[in-house]
Amino acid sequence: MKIIRTVLGDIPASEIGKTDSHDHLIRSGGPEVVRNPMFLMDDTAAAKREFGAFLASGGKTMVCMDPIGCGRNVGKMAEIAEAYRGQGNLVMVTGFHKAENYDPRVSFLATVDEKKIAALMCLEITDGMDLHSYNGPVVERTAYKAGLIKAGTSYRLITYLEQTAL
């Protein structure tokens, strides 16, 4: 059977409905927020209203494309998903953004080999995402699983760090 892996669990692919394939409801921090505070989206009540408006307009599934280390907040996204259980679906991602969002000297993309990065992404899909988005010093794996792998690249270029993630 073909499935869609949502934050709250797998559903038959036939239940996906109208889908917003790239959106952002919560961004609790990260490099983009450091560069431009207007990118901060950390208000769960506002995110619930936004998702509710999407559902009211005929949408069914929203894919939130905030990857590891870029302000992803698994706990808040799970709260939103629970608020709309049975009404709509949220899908979260594992993977990585463009290299400009990671330190080229000390980020795990720069210091960890490809096999370990691939294993980490597989765990996010099979076992659950880290509650803290690997901001350390511990990993606290949740029951909420990623449904897609994001592979962000620079414009007209794939950098060395991006190649590592790919």
What are these model-predicted stretches?
Residues 1-107:
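N-terminal hydrophobic targeting/anchoring segments and the immediately downstream early-domain regions
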Residues 79-82, 89-166:
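Active-site gating/metal-coordination segments in enzymes
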